[in-house]
């Protein structure tokens, strides 16, 4: 989330673990969404799949989603569509493996960590 926030032109509201956030944080997220501001948030796949109102639901309906481990059971429900086409059955739980879901389309992605000793360039591993 931090890397995405740094790449944004405006200052987004960044919330880690929105599903565990207090009411004040959730209220700030809902207000930012109502003003069409950029919000970057993370939440558990299970909670995203089973929440039908509030900030998590609004973001799931309107925004791009990054779903990690797209082959696991609640991922399709969280995304609102089948993620089978972007799931590698040989690497269901490979760290950082995911899907980018936006407006009815999905793309496979691989999230990587930056190398601190190398100006935050990503660590590249063959997959």
Regions found by a protein language model. Name each.
Residues 1-26, 38-42:
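Conserved P-loop NTPase "ATPase switch" module shared by AAA+ and STAND
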